[in-house]
Amino acid sequence: MDKKLKKYIERYDLIQNCANYELKPNGGMIVLINQETECEIVIANSVYALASFQAVLINAYEVSVDIQANRALNLIAIRFKGAGASFFYEGEMERLMQMPKAPIFIEKNILENELDSYFKNRLTASQLPFNIMKIIDLLDTQGSDYNIDEVMAIANIPRKILDKIFNLRTGLSFKTYASLSKLDY
């Protein structure tokens, strides 16, 4: 894998020689590329058909995603770090937030031997506004516990950037804000 892509992509997994496969949760989004066999993706008891040579973007998930076919599968699973997929599929992020449990069908005919060049061509600087609050809201609606370090990992944002933006928005550093919020009135 190209060095530049390693910042956003955890790894490429080949899924072959089996008719059923279970994708374990990893905390990041996944692009699933079907290289050959028509199959079904089962997410939260909903079934989605995946045609030959079709690719889908699957949101981060808490329970396993099952893949089923009548013959041997031939898939590639691209596992992203945190919100790394948003740098490649920014246009799909709004749909993904509206339907977080449904896969987003993205493209056809992505070839295994051209993955690095495909992702290098798709890589763009994010134009989305700073959206940590959107992530916190999503975690709240799912009833998840979280801390700021987990949110930053999901958003793929370094602590230094968060501190700078927090200071710009509030006029205070985290340390000053924390000491003020502990004062009893």
What are the roles of these predicted feature ranges?
Residues M1-D149, A155-R159, S173:
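Alpha-helical bundle regulatory/interaction domains
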Residues L96-K101, S179-Y185:
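Short, intrinsically disordered, charge-balanced linker/junction segments flanking boundaries
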